[in-house]
Amino acid sequence: MSTFLTDEGIAPAVLGPALEERGLDALFVAEHTHIPASRETPYPGGGELPRVYYRSLDPFVALAAAAAVTRTLLLGTGIALVVQRDPIVTAKEVATLDLVSGGRAVFGVGAGWNREEMRNHGTDPRTRGRLMDERVRAVVELWTREQAEFHGEFVDFDPVYCWPKPVQRPHPPIYVGGGGDHAFARVAAYGAAWMPTGVPPKRLGEQIDRLRQTTGTDTPVVVYGAPRDRESLDLYAALGVERVLLHLPTRPEDATLQRLDEYAGLVAAYR
């Protein structure tokens, strides 16, 4: 599942077990720290910005709540806005989630779209791609070295100790969001998978070919916010997509559980 967890929807500690009980094996949650009251950047989905963007929970706190009451559920960010995050703090948060969940964390990353939100974090939108790449590489250094250091254009720190280290080795998988050549280059550099958002199957095949030409490997593809009709799911399967994350609307508990029952029936044929 991919969703926005908010103060108005189902609680993560209820949602996690409900997913496991229905044979749904992953929970990926979105991140926005805030929404500026004055915004010029258009919403990529068109129209007004949905209410859930204004009210989203901190992803790592929410995923930790789900981790505490589940045993097998994958717990991922979809996506963590790395360009708005301190890499040392982020390394500790992801590693802690991986530890408390017994090795179930997935670090989904992206460069974001809301320029005003970025600026409030001191990020220049024009250089956010290079900033993201450095911060992800710095996080990996912090995860994998007893004494980590990093010296780049945007990230610079002398040798430090940063614990805990992740349970997964060498580190939690990094799923790279976004599309196009820049995203494919990031997958080649540090990604375990490419995570496009809602790309229809008829367009995805050509993009997968370009991705794998860039990476030189049979790179896994995880579709975030996938359409929930059986025809699309069949086409994704035929393309070799490893996983689809169906979009779960943000609703109160009863309505969410009813929707999960519908999803469980839909995905049963693909297990």
Across the structure, where does each feature detected by a protein language model lie?
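Active-site-adjacent structural elements that line small-molecule/cofactor binding pockets in enzymes
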Residues: 1-271
